[in-house]
Swiss-Prot record:
This is Phosphoribosylaminoimidazole-succinocarboxamide synthase. Keywords: ATP-binding, Ligase, Nucleotide-binding, Purine biosynthesis. Its EC number is 6.3.2.6. It comes from Pectobacterium atrosepticum (strain SCRI 1043 / ATCC BAA-672) (Erwinia carotovora subsp. atroseptica). The gene is purC. It holds the Pfam family SAICAR_synt. CDD domains: SAICAR_synt_PurC.
Amino acid sequence: MQKLAELYRGKAKTVYTTEDPDLLVLEFRNDTSAGDGARIEQFDRKGMVNNKFNHFIMSKLEEAGIPTQMVSLLSDNEVLVKKLEMVPVECVVRNRAAGSLVKRLGIEEGIELNPPLFDLFLKNDAMHDPMVNESYCKTFGWVSEENLARMKELSYKANDVLSKLFGDAGLILVDFKLEFGLFNGEVVLGDEFSPDGSRLWDKETLNKMDKDRFRQSLGGLIEAYEEVAHRIGVKLD
């Protein structure tokens, strides 16, 4: 499938149209950003690692009965995906306290959250992705109650699948972000799942193995991503 015109350029991915109006090409770049794009750096191999990581995870979720936009792996840094009508709200599942939750509530980083928390954020970089809730979604018409309920159901199902996958590899799935869209009226998981949009800690050392290494200037970003990929069985080379 040949990519045609650039449709959208995000912080780390570029989206292209194809000759099929229902299919797009996602290109994963080497860019890494923090602070809503205020800080951007390039890391060799990052686009390839995230692309293959995402394809692997989406395949696992499909096997578990979670519909995703994934069609096929095209190259080291490109995948073919279904064109979704994206919901402007993203879902976050939290198994342990970290990131904005710690800042917002003043709680200790790393405490277990049982049952896991489910948060919603409006996708708006200019407004720093403000936190919203179900009533906002209904009032502003961002997503129907039925589709939002399905998004929540699929987010928790993904959490069950991925917590076990990472847990078996000696990793803690601390939290993660999911984005959904509609394809022929069905709620489908879109965007990506990678260490860019999740927090993953080593079970033994609690070392951070995700984009917090970049956000907090810890170094070793790609080495951490590749280590996580290796542990869960992603074939990179």
